[in-house]
């Protein structure tokens, strides 16, 4: 039997760390198909912190792709599970036959599916990537992403799977300890990445609420982002008074981030694709409703779980927000499919499917 190999094909430290810790702590003990990893980037202590995993690190995306292709060609029974697929060379290998469809299983993360960049390089590559995506052996994704993908590639197998957000189920009832009243606090975006469209989001919040709310913008990740942070701060101060605007430019530890989220009354996410599920989960867990772009297909996942969804096109005010909070508080969080531990069983299924052990 050939053991499944997992591929983290791009150096995305935060997400890669989450995946590796999840596999080490939760999956590796029960499945031999959850232990082998090829990772783009430096070790950064992963080998030491994930002793249950066999990790190989590669200095660049290109070097990793060459190693994957070599393994694929050497043994056509070898299967790979790609966690997010932002590696151009691997898509091209799937197109050229270097990697066969039956060897290629892909967990969609979001930006690896949607065609939102306007750069010339991306616009030229997207059509090729789209063809390659239709050749994968199978995809794993959120309900909304599966729906989006199936419209383009109806013949490719798709299975429901959620990114393993770090969650403590014991916190599901914690939100009820806080009485919500007074000035609203609104979280804008889930990180400092430009895909959050912070400036457009700040303008949208201002248009809805004026300078009557506290606005919190977490921008501590990614690193080396000061110029963009300054740009967002300048735009924010043109709309909101200094006491109502909080731009967080330092990276936060998880517990501090959790505490920050629980001080908020509303999350505001303007991006037109699925991203930031981790932050959405933590907000929902705390009975904090989220405003989504109607083009973000994750609203389908939320509606399927009978969660209230607010849209950027809705007329929003404090009364609407408080009602959404009330509705969220009435939901039994233990039954939400994309919460821990409910997302675990689909991961076990995904491993068997990708390894060729399940129909």
Swiss-Prot record:
Function: Catalyzes the synthesis of Und-PP-GlcNAc-ManNAcA-Fuc4NAc (Lipid III), the third lipid-linked intermediate involved in ECA synthesis.
Localization per record: Cell inner membrane
Keyword Transferase: yes
EC numbers on record: 2.4.1.325
Name of the protein in question: TDP-N-acetylfucosamine:lipid II N-acetylfucosaminyltransferase
Pathway in which the depicted protein is active: Bacterial outer membrane biogenesis; enterobacterial common antigen biosynthesis
Enzyme kind, highest EC tier: transferase
UniProt catalytic activity: beta-D-ManNAcA-(1->4)-alpha-D-GlcNAc-di-trans,octa-cis-undecaprenyl diphosphate + dTDP-4-acetamido-4,6-dideoxy-alpha-D-galactose = alpha-D-FucNAc4-(1->4)-beta-D-ManNAcA-(1->4)-D-GlcNAc-undecaprenyl diphosphate + dTDP + H(+)
GO (cellular component) term, any one: plasma membrane
Pfam families per UniProt: Glyco_transf_56
Organism (species): Salmonella choleraesuis (strain SC-B67)
Family of this protein: Belongs to the glycosyltransferase 56 family.
Membrane topology category: Peripheral membrane protein
Keywords in alphabetical order: Cell inner membrane, Cell membrane, Glycosyltransferase, Membrane, Transferase
Primary location: membrane
Molecular function GO labels: 4-acetamido-4,6-dideoxy-D-galactose transferase activity; fucosyltransferase activity
GO biological process, one term: enterobacterial common antigen biosynthetic process
